[in-house]
């Protein structure tokens, strides 16, 4: 079956790398913020880099907030895109001094990682502990490494389908209904990341 794959055009910097990662798997992909295109998609990606406050501002200016909430097909938020699915974020610019209201599609609140002596941001390769049998991680080795770059994270909760440890446990992957999210960058995570993208496209 031919999949209608759409990356929601959030205006963020990593859209092209996500697009290339999907195309490498043999799928055609469209980048769009047109409601007709977005709502007709079989699978959607919500990429994000930068701060939550800037990203929510971009979504507001592009009339994307209500559109994302209307999506009924599987949507995968990547990195900041995952965090935006939560209720709120502490991330405003360089300082956690104001709460940013997010999309409220997942019952999680994004907070600054408490890492003790470990440096922030959490940057580099790390393993994740997956909820057994979740289809997003089909065929991925339990000790597979994924690439992370972040200082804020969603805590572990009922929505967590994989968690990671960096000073504290946090959600590495989440699901709430048709909304999925990964804190790591699958498009930069070699074979394991490519397999995860393929698994999502085959859901």
Curated annotation (Swiss-Prot):
Q: What is its EC number?
A: 4.3.2.10, 3.5.1.2
* PROSITE patterns referenced in this protein's UniProt entry, alphabetically: GATASE_TYPE_1 (PS51273)
Places the protein is found: Cytoplasm
Q: Which UniProt keywords apply?
A: Amino-acid biosynthesis, Cytoplasm, Glutamine amidotransferase, Histidine biosynthesis, Hydrolase, Lyase
Q: Does the keyword Amino-acid biosynthesis apply?
A: yes
Cited InterPro entries:
Class_I_gatase-like, GATASE, Imidazole-glycPsynth_HisH
A Pfam family that the UniProt record links to this protein: GATase
Q: Name one GO cellular component term.
A: cytoplasm
Output the GO biological process annotations, alphabetical, semicolon-separated: L-histidine biosynthetic process
| Catalytic activity, as annotated | 5-[(5-phospho-1-deoxy-D-ribulos-1-ylimino)methylamino]-1-(5-phospho-beta-D-ribosyl)imidazole-4-carboxamide + L-glutamine = D-erythro-1-(imidazol-4-yl)glycerol 3-phosphate + 5-amino-1-(5-phospho-beta-D-ribosyl)imidazole-4-carboxamide + L-glutamate + H(+); L-glutamine + H2O = L-glutamate + NH4(+)
Q: Which GO terms describe its molecular function?
A: glutaminase activity; imidazoleglycerol-phosphate synthase activity; lyase activity
Where in the sequence is the active site? 79, 185, 187
Q: Which domain of life is it from?
A: Bacteria
Q: Give the metabolic or biological pathway.
A: Amino-acid biosynthesis; L-histidine biosynthesis; L-histidine from 5-phospho-alpha-D-ribose 1-diphosphate: step 5/9
Q: Which residues form the Glutamine amidotransferase type-1 domain?
A: 4-203
Q: What do we know about how this protein assembles, alone or with others?
A: Heterodimer of HisH and HisF.
Please name the NCBIfam families in this protein's record: IMP_synth_hisH
* Known role: IGPS catalyzes the conversion of PRFAR and glutamine to IGP, AICAR and glutamate. The HisH subunit catalyzes the hydrolysis of glutamine to glutamate and ammonia as part of the synthesis of IGP and AICAR. The resulting ammonia molecule is channeled to the active site of HisF.
Official protein name in the record:
Imidazole glycerol phosphate synthase subunit HisH
The gene it comes from is hisH
């Amino acid at each position: 079956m031919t999949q209608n794959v759409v990356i929601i055009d959030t205006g963020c910097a990593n859209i092209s790398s996500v697009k290339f990662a999907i195309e490498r798997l043999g799928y055609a992909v469209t980048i769009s913020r047109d409601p007709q295109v977005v709502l007709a998609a079989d699978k959607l990606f919500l990429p994000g880099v930068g701060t939550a406050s800037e990203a929510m501002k971009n979504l507001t200016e592009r009339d994307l907030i209500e559109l994302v909430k209307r999506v009924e097909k599987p949507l995968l938020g990547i990195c900041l895109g995952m965090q935006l699915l939560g209720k709120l974020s502490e991330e405003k610019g360089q300082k956690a001094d104001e709460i940013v209201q997010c999309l409220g599609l997942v019952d999680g609140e994004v907070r600054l990682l408490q890492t003790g002596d470990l440096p922030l941001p959490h940057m580099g390769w790390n393993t994740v502990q997956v909820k057994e049998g979740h289809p997003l991680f089909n065929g991925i080795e339990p000790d597979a490494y994924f690439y992370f770059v972040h200082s804020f994270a969603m805590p572990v909760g009922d929505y967590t389908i994989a968690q990671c440890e960096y000073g504290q446990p946090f959600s590495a992957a989440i699901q709430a209904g048709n909304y999925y999210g990964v804190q790591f960058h699958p498009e930069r995570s070699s074979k394991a990341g490519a397999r995860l993208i393929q698994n999502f496209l085959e859901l």
